[in-house]
Design a protein with these regions (language model features):
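Short helix-initiation/N-cap motifs at beta->coil->alpha
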Residues: 72-83, 87, 96-99, 184-223, ...
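Extracytoplasmic small-molecule ligand-binding "clamshell" domains
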Residues: 35-101
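An extracytoplasmic/periplasmic, membrane-proximal ligand-sensing/linker region
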Residues: 34-40, 46-57, 283-351
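A conserved helix-loop-strand patch within extracytoplasmic ligand-binding domains
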Residues: 115-184
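Extended ligand-binding regions for polar small-molecule ligands
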Residues: 59-63, 125, 130-144, 249-320
């Protein structure tokens, strides 16, 4: 009889087919889709002489921590980062403070964390520096609330770090305009009006240096004050000590005065460090919390510390949010004439 052998053959064939079918995923899903993913917008170089500086090591670290497929999305500008986050091409990105503020204000991007500066802070303070004995210094030091050192800046010669620099121009001018000391001169929608606003409040000799000139940058602004070319220098809270307050005096600049000659007026506001941005409309709170925890874990291991140092150029990361990290900066620069249009053009953002 042939029935029994035929039955056995059919049984074997069905068993083999069942095994094959059991190992095949549905046609709309493959192995890569069984895990969540994370895309990081990052400016990637064509080649890295030091492999430890390659952001791929950051990607690999986060992939292991999150159990996600983490990839890099190459970008070439801050504007491209904003666009990538807006339209969901990338999930997170490390950004410049000014571009981050634009992304937050115009497109409701959020902040997960921020990098630390060498002193552990996630910001630096912008200040006006004057010389001891000046009427501005005396007004500040006299403990008399009726004497206002900022009002006394009117008509003086200012020393800025450069055109549209944060601590050297945007933050102090945003403060002076926003608090009614200075009045915008010209078209309030044109960034060029800021130059006339500066000379209108201070005087025509306001020092707004170009790159490569003697008074450019933080050192240049303090030099401008020190040699009395100007009456006030706008710089960071740490600037004077960096150039003129070293324990070994040979490290000080030759134009420095004694540290007791410099008086720091109250701060205008905070310039933020680089934040890690994301789009809350694309990433839910649970995933955002997981990503933040993985990023902060970089602080906790030798491997993570190497990535922080070599790839991100920071001693550490701190959890924060957009309001806390960008609010002080934005509250001041919003008073600068034409600033939104300027940033839109600078970062090539299409509305």
């Amino acid at each position: 009889m042939m029935i029994k052998p035929i039955f056995l053959i059919l049984l074997i064939m069905m068993s083999s087919l069942a095994g094959c079918l059991g190992s095949v995923l549905p046609p709309d899903m493959d192995d890569s889709e069984s895990r969540d993913s994370l895309v990081i917008a990052y400016e990637v170089k064509d080649d890295y002489e030091n492999p430890d500086e390659n952001p791929q090591v950051l990607s690999d670290f986060l992939s292991a921590k999150l159990d996600m497929d983490v990839t890099l999305y190459p970008i070439i500008s801050e504007g491209a980062i904003i666009e990538a986050l807006r339209f969901g091409h990338a999930d997170i990105a490390f950004m410049d403070g000014a571009a981050a503020w634009m992304g937050w204000q115009q497109y409701e991007l959020g902040v997960l964390a921020a990098d630390q500066k060498d002193d552990g802070r996630t910001y630096y303070e912008a200040h006006a520096w004057v010389l001891n004995g000046s009427e501005m210094a005396e007004a500040y030091l006299d403990s008399d609330d009726s004497t206002d050192p900022f009002a006394l800046l009117q008509g003086k010669t200012s020393c800025h770090t450069g055109w549209l620099k944060s601590a050297g121009m945007l933050l102090p001018m945003g403060y002076l305009i926003g608090n009614g000391y200075a009045t915008v001169q010209g078209n309030s929608d044109d960034i060029a009006s800021l130059r006339d606003t500066i000379t209108g409040f201070f005087n025509d000799n306001a020092n707004i240096p170009e790159s490569g000139t003697p008074y450019y940058g933080y050192a240049g602004a303090v030099k401008c004050l020190s040699d009395e070319t100007g009456d006030v220098a706008f710089a960071k809270d740490s600037t004077v000590a960096k150039y003129c307050g070293n324990e070994n005096a040979s490290y000080n600049e030759d134009w420095c005065l004694g540290m007791e000659r410099y008086v720091k007026l109250p701060g205008f506001g905070k310039a933020p460090s680089h934040p890690i941005m994301y789009n809350p409309s694309k990433i839910d709170t649970t995933k955002a919390a997981k990503i933040t925890a993985a990023l902060l874990s970089l602080n906790d291991s030798p491997e993570g510390q190497e990535i922080l140092s070599n790839v991100l150029n920071t001693p550490g990361l701190v959890e924060t949010n957009a309001e806390d990290h960008l609010g002080s900066y934005g509250g001041l620069v919003q008073h600068i004439p034409g600033i939104s249009t300027y940033f839109n053009d600078k970062y090539s953002i299409e509305n």
